[in-house]
């Protein structure tokens, strides 16, 4: 039996270290995978498994809005991945108020103002009836505009408020937009009628034409027409703005693209294969030499 000499032991240990050094870069290359968040460079010759979590970049593969993102195809020499539902810990998206909700809140305020304008029209129209027996000629009152105009203003304002409370109802939203446009047209008609009232009755407010009592009725009628003219101008602006906001919300409902959040992928455990020529241990070499 041949006993190992000191020189042979040195040669064996040297060959062992050289083989380990040549295997070490190969093991590091097998451990690193593209897109991983960490790299394990343990030089243990035995098989080991490590779970690798990869996050797909947003531009790594195309995503069509409104469709389920497909799993990207990886080469056969790389581990296949599967989707994990949810978000990474600590990466919860910030909860922000959508623009459509902010627009609807503005529409609710404008709708409340429209209701008040409609009530003012009905109230001042009732006061104008008391001046029918004077020399004041209310053309707008003969057409009944303070009443039917005020009713339409109240209806359009109520629909604007209801659209904010039920933002997912397309019927309320479309009805609010349509009635706001109609209210804007009605307020434009009312502006022309009240301007006509003021222009006709303004020549009768001087004391030389009628006694004081009749002149007071004309002054009261002109003052009421002036106030209603101001409210009609306000209603025209509010109805136009409400229609604009309603169209914006309708566009947000019909053309709302889906928000694409990058998915989290988990690769299958990577098993480091053993080298084709495993490193012999010192005891095995000694036994073989014997």
UniProtKB/Swiss-Prot annotation:
The keyword tRNA processing does not apply. Residues 1-25 are annotated as: Disordered. It is found in: Membrane. Expressed strongly in intestine and colon and minimally in lung and ovary. Residues 130-138, 196-220 are extracellular. Its main location: membrane. Residues 1-108, 160-174, 242-290 are cytoplasmic. Coiled coil: none annotated. It is a multi-pass membrane protein. One of its GO terms (cellular component) is plasma membrane. Residues 1-21 have a biased composition (Polar residues). This is Membrane-spanning 4-domains subfamily A member 8.
